[in-house]
């Protein structure tokens, strides 16, 4: 009996990868229940097993652990699929279910004779790297990347590619519109730690983003206007790069966060004493490269209607290098736009007044 590890569909035919082999089988035309034993093909372009298969733009891509090749419908023979001349990569795939159709192309986690753990997307018949050195450094420290699972979705005009590494307990997301990566996680409030995000599958149906959670066996709706995660608290977090001035002492006078304020609920949140309070963000900083963190400061983001509320902190001490961290857990839409820092070194401002923090970081990077 043949065991099939993956199935896909192209031009009226179903394709199935034969498990632990470099062969695949094609069904009868428009009949996924009939599989002719004569319609089994062996890929001679690479000797190792097929790791992953993906259909995109009426082409069937087969990825081994070190190389890849695409087939197309030639219109001749039965079944009519043959290799595409020139559609051969000296790169393979390191994760069977990490391959995904993303932003009108294919994305996969690369593996080859030289190494592994790069995120690539197909650009024509070439692989284009989209992961960064920092992302790859993190992935290459994982116990395995072979169990990675990914899905793609589009929301608020952005195309996202979400990749979860179950053994490493981590989830990463790439934004094709900005070219930036971010981490996504499930916040365990009792332990005070993040774990991988609980969703590993997605479909868009009934005008809804529906995601599968293997932990509960349930399907949930993913919605930007829902501020809980499976009924649990969502903890958002942003962390800055290191702020330095040639390792000299920096005196930090003020940091202000440009946040849409006045979005508190009615009735208001209440504090530990039962008194009304506005939504809050939590500010911390580290002066030793994130090895240790100081006190947590709660910054008020304004009750409902306090749209002019400023979110800032003064008297910030000094350091030779500092990393800022902002986090939040209140179930409202925190829209954090920018941050502004007032700081001096040797009596001179380290940044021009009013300069955007992103531009400040660019200058010191």
Q: Model-derived features: where do they sit?
A:
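Beta-sheet repeat architectures centered on beta-propellers
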Residues: 85-365
């Amino acid at each position: 009996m043949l065991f099939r590890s993956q199935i896909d569909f192209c031009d009226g035919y179903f394709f199935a990868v034969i498990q632990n082999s470099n062969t695949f089988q094609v069904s009868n035309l428009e009949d996924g229940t009939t599989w002719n034993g004569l319609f089994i093909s062996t890929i001679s372009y690479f000797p190792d097993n097929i790791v992953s298969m993906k259909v995109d733009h009426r082409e069937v891509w087969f990825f081994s652990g070190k190389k890849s090749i695409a087939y197309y419908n030639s219109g001749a023979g039965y079944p009519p699929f043959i290799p595409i001349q020139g559609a051969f990569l000296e790169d393979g795939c390191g994760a069977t279910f990490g391959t995904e159709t993303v932003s009108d192309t294919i994305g996969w986690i690369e593996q080859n004779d030289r190494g592994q753990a790069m995120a690539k997307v197909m650009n024509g018949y070439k692989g284009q790297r989209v992961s960064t050195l920092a992302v790859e450094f993190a992935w290459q420290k994982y116990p395995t990347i072979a169990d990675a699972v990914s899905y793609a979705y589009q929301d608020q005009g952005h195309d996202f590619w979400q990749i979860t590494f179950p053994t490493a307990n981590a989830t990463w997301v790439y934004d094709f519109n900005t070219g930036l990566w971010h981490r996504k996680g499930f916040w365990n409030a009792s332990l005070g730690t993040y774990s991988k995000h609980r969703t590993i599958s997605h479909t868009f149906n009934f005008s809804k983003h529906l995601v599968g959670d293997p932990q509960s066996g349930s399907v949930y709706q993913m919605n930007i206007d829902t501020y809980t995660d499976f009924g649990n608290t969502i903890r958002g977090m942003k962390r800055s790069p290191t702020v330095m001035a040639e390792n000299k002492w920096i005196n930090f006078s003020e940091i202000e966060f440009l946040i849409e304020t006045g979005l508190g609920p009615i009735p208001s949140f209440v504090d530990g004493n039962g008194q009304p309070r506005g939504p809050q963000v939590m500010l911390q900083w580290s002066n030793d490269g994130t090895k240790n963190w100081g006190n947590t400061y709660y910054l008020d983001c304004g009750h409902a209607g306090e749209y002019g509320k400023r979110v800032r902190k003064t008297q910030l001490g000094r350091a030779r290098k500092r990393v800022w961290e902002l986090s939040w857990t209140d179930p409202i839409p925190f829209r954090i736009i920018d941050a502004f820092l007032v700081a001096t070194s040797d009596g001179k401002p380290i940044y021009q007044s009013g300069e955007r923090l992103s531009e400040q970081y660019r200058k010191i990077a």
